[in-house]
Amino acid sequence: MAVLNPMTLGIYLQLFFCSIVSQPTFINSVLPISAALPGLDQKKRGNHKACCLLMPPPPPLFPPPFFRGSRSPLLSPDMKNLLELEASPSPCMQGSLGSPGPPGPQGPPGLPGKAGPKGEKGDLGRPGRKGRPGPPGVPGEPGPVGWPGPEGPRGEKGDVGMMGLPGSRGPMGSKGFPGSRGEKGSRGERGDLGPKGEKGFPGFPGMLGQKGEMGPKGESGIAGHRGPTGRPGKRGKQGQKGDSGIMGPPGKPGPSGQPGRQGPPGPPGPPSAGQLVMGLKGERGFPGPPGRCLCGPPANVNNPSYGDPMYGRGSPRVPAIFVVNNQEELEKLNTQNAIAFRRDQRSLYFKDSLGWLPIQLTPFYPVGLHHKAAWHLCGDGVLQPGEECDDGNPDVSDGCIDCHRAYCGDGYRHRGVEDCDGSDFGYLKCETYLPGSYGELRCTQYCSIDSTPCRYFT
């Protein structure tokens, strides 16, 4: 038997179902349409129109759903559509009912309908039967250790057992309370004198103790050998100025100097009897005419021709003022009637026909300062009158301080000669002079350090 194609089989089934549905006897046997719609037969009977051939409807694409359940007078929407098709007016006359045909094959199951709304909650049912006991569970973990129970009554003493092996030594017990003091025992006999022990090693030197008071003067000892020569002592304070010595013999006369300039003639004095007597100072004269300013630019240094002279064209004029360092630079200048200032001597010179002549023999000092207080001269490295020394540096720890020789008591520690001077210890303290001590050092009148005030920690 040949197997049909599924598509061909589907077409045959649709044609078969359509032929069955077209017969009203089969439909009436399956579904009582007449009972549900009583006016349908009357409509068909009252219609006496011409009869025509009934063409079967086209087969549906899908087979009709299979009806399950009890027959109900209420029809589904698909059945209503089918009844409307049958209720349509037909020109053919309905014949007599034929015999019922054989039941058709069971159709395929229909698609499930949509879920209806959820119903109301029903009443509580009866309790079910008790289920079987389940398998035993896993044993639980052990619980915490409980509190110890009350101590029971002491039992009776048992029989003496066999002596066992000696056990290990137990822990040392706590120290007991001191016992009562016993009575003093009798004095024992003196033992024999033991042999003399060997001499021990010398111990470590102890800490430096405090200086004790001066003890009584002891007896004079035997003259010892002469010790080595010590280092020279500290320099003493500056002594008082001694008496002036006897004047020495006069020295040899020096070479004759250059002749000085001839001074202006003085006023005629009063006649005298062979002796010159200086008269009294006269009154102050009237002020002279005001001077004139020479403000014109110089034409030439060696031959000046600027400005009008105050006292006529015949008076000499100073063309320029030069600043030189020493005598060599001064001799190189050939400008007549010029003034030069020497830095090494701090003095002025004037150029004359005879050469350079000094104007000031001593340096110039500010007004109000004494000659010995020439502070601007000290430290230039040149020894000048009024200075004991001049090393040209501001160091106060050497032998020359402020152009005076250092001495013990000037307040400055002379490096390499003095240990201290006043409060100048050279950055020394008790902590650095005597390690491990504290306090303040003291300077003696001989410029040496006294460490008596230093104390050690005890």
Swiss-Prot record:
Purpose: Anchors the catalytic subunits of asymmetric AChE to the synaptic basal lamina.
The protein's name: Acetylcholinesterase collagenic tail peptide
Domain notes: The proline-rich attachment domain (PRAD) binds the AChE catalytic subunits.
Transmembrane residue ranges: none
Lineage summary: Eukaryota, Metazoa, Chordata, Craniata, Vertebrata
Gene Ontology BP term (one): skeletal muscle acetylcholine-gated channel clustering
Location of the region described as Disordered in the Swiss-Prot/TrEMBL record: 89-291
Span of the signal peptide: 1-22
Membership in a protein family: Belongs to the COLQ family.
The organism's place on the tree of life at top rank: Eukaryota
Principal location: other
Post-translational modification comment from the UniProt entry: The triple-helical tail is stabilized by disulfide bonds at each end.
Subunit structure: Homotrimer. Component of the asymmetric form of AChE, a disulfide-bonded oligomer composed of the collagenic subunits (Q) and a variable number of asymmetric catalytic subunits (T). The N-terminal of a collagenic subunit (Q) associates with the C-terminal of a catalytic subunit (T).
Matches recorded under NCBIfam families: myxo_disulf_rpt (TIGR02232)
Bias kind Basic and acidic residues: ranges: 117-126, 181-199
GO molecular function: extracellular matrix structural constituent conferring tensile strength; heparin binding; structural molecule activity
Region Heparan sulfate proteoglycan binding: start-end pairs: 129-132, 234-237
